[in-house]
């Protein structure tokens, strides 16, 4: 059975429009990625507020990109506003787990320990993050509360660690020695961390 020409033309137009839309979306995402990668964070925010991303990006993705840009620019208040919008958007289960980790990291690095503790409580209640929660609790206690009770444990762990794990452990050990007032040991472990990072 052959389709009548009158039906073939609209079908062809629809297919062309779908392909054109997919190409436009890919180019748009590529442009946003390039702006971020090249450190043009202000330009990225302007682009994300332009008509095409506002119309065609999922709101969650657009806000997340803006959060990352504001965080990179050091605009803490604007980044925090984006986080509030992201949490208010009722993210999917996997998105929420990722968002909680990002929010915890952001608040800890910004020195907003009260907010970090609130997020940590949510992390500890989230079954998808049960493996990460104890380690994040240690990070919080070390950085926000001046804890130094994990030195021996972490020194044992770091002897078998490499890459990002070793870097994280060296920095946490250094912070604990700093908390104890042993600046010589703190400097020693910071130097080790710098060596891993180079």
Residue ranges of each PLM-predicted region?
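N-terminal signal-anchor transmembrane alpha helix of single-pass membrane proteins
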Residues: 1-31
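Generic helix N-cap/helix-start motif at coil->alpha-helix transitions
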Residues: 20-30, 55-64, 92-101, 127-137, ...
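Short juxtamembrane segments adjacent to a transmembrane helix
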Residues: 29-50
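Residue-level signature for tetratricopeptide repeat
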Residues: 30, 34, 65-72, 105-106, ...
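Structural motif corresponding to the intra-repeat A-B loop/turn of tetratricopeptide repeats
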Residues: 38, 73, 110, 144-148, ...
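Alpha-helical repeat scaffolds
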Residues: 43-51, 76-88, 112-127, 148-162, ...
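Acidic, Ser/Thr-rich low-complexity segments on the non-lumenal side of membrane proteins
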Residues: 44-74
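Alpha-helical oligomerization segments
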Residues: 170-198
């Amino acid at each position: 059975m052959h389709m009548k020409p009158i039906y073939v033309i609209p079908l062809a137009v629809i297919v062309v429009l779908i392909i054109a839309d997919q190409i436009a979306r890919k180019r748009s995402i590529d442009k946003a990625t390039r702006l971020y990668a090249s450190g043009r964070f202000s330009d990225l925010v302007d682009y994300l507020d332009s008509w095409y991303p506002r119309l065609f990006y999922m709101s969650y993705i657009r806000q997340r990109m803006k959060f990352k840009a504001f965080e990179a620019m050091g605009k803490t208040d604007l980044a925090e506003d984006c986080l509030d919008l992201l949490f208010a958007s009722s993210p999917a289960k996997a998105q929420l787990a990722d968002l909680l980790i990002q929010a915890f990291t952001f608040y800890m690095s910004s020195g907003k320990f009260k907010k970090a503790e609130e997020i940590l409580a949510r992390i500890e209640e989230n079954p998808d993050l049960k493996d990460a929660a104890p380690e994040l609790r240690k990070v919080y206690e070390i950085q926000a509360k001046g804890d130094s009770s994990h030195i021996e444990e972490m020194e044992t762990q770091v002897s078998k660690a490499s890459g990002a794990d070793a870097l994280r452990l060296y920095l946490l050990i250094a912070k604990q020695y700093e908390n104890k007032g042993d600046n010589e040991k703190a400097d020693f472990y910071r130097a080790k961390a710098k060596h891993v990072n180079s």
